[in-house]
From Swiss-Prot:
Top-level taxonomy: Eukaryota, Metazoa, Ecdysozoa, Arthropoda, Hexapoda
Protein name: Protein unc-119 homolog
Residues given in the record as tetradecanoate binding sites: 154
Gene: unc-119
Keywords, alphabetical: Lipid-binding, Protein transport, Transport
Tissue-by-tissue expression: Expressed in nervous system.
Length: 265
């Protein structure tokens, strides 16, 4: 099995109590040897998000509309044109530091990426020291692209589309505020066709905590003609990941996917 990863946009993570959740897909993938490459991108245009979704399924909404609800994103009929919230909406300082994908049938790790230790806050800091470190980091990042880290590009071999059940482990840290009803809704499209929706509950997370959760992705079989089209159309398979705390949208990340086993773009 060939597994290749390239870290350009480190995913964010950390560790503590581990939780496993599962969700069924509206369409998906299935079984053994897969290679995967991941590229970080710039995440689209800078500044506050300028597009969103209404209950009608429209994928555009003014950036100042900060009341995007879970029900609205569940009714989207296409990938969003831009981010539905600004990077500054993450007032809970949720920071993903590690991400791993594994085939649950074979146990094979298909992909793993982590933020370098130098970019993670060391353990054992007091709350004041942690807040000071965060403030120093923000001052260094003032001129950076506000959407950096919100977009990632993956390249898989065609075999990935044969996988039936995949475990995605994410590790993350939380800032000074607790997370109540932390939830992720992930929508996958091929062009304007909805492939699958995943809806995961993280539950409650303590302030200044490190957390590990594994989401179980259960994929039904895709029609052979659709699989062939997805393989021949790299990066036309895309996803939106929406993160809510107490039904308030606090993070929106994007990704696109290729299944042709090609080189990193």
């Amino acid at each position: 099995m060939s597994v290749v990863g390239k870290q350009l946009n480190p995913v964010q993570s950390s560790g503590a109590g581990a939780v496993t959740t599962s969700s069924s897909a509206a369409a998906g993938s299935s079984s053994s040897n897969s290679g995967v490459e991941a590229n970080g991108g710039s995440g689209g245009s800078s500044g506050a998000a300028a597009a969103g979704a209404g209950a009608s399924g429209d994928a555009k909404r003014p950036a100042e509309s900060s009341s995007v609800t879970p029900d609205e994103v569940l009714h989207l009929t296409k990938i969003t044109d831009d981010y539905l919230c600004s990077a500054n909406a993450n007032v809970f300082e949720i920071d993903f530091t590690r991400f791993k994908i594994r085939d649950l049938e074979s146990g094979a790790v298909l992909f793993e990426i982590a933020k370098p230790p130098s970019e993670q806050y060391p353990e054992g800091l007091s709350s004041d020291e942690t807040m000071l470190a965060a403030a120093e980091k923000l001052s260094l990042d003032d001129t950076a692209d506000p959407n950096a880290g919100r977009y990632v590009r993956y390249q898989f071999t065609p075999a990935f589309l044969n996988l039936k059940t995949v475990g995605a482990t994410v590790e993350f840290t939380v800032g000074s505020q607790p997370l109540n009803n932390f939830r992720m809704i992930e929508r996958h499209f091929f062009r304007d066709r909805l492939l699958k929706t995943f809806d995961f509950e993280f539950g409650f997370c303590f302030p200044f905590s490190k957390n590990t959760v594994e989401h179980i992705y259960e994929f039904p079989n895709l029609p052979p003609d659709l699989v062939a089209e997805m393989i021949s159309s790299p990066f036309e398979t895309r996803s939106d990941s929406f993160y809510f705390v107490g039904n308030r949208l606090v993070m929106h990340n994007k990704a696109d996917y290729a299944y042709d086993g090609g080189n990193i773009v």
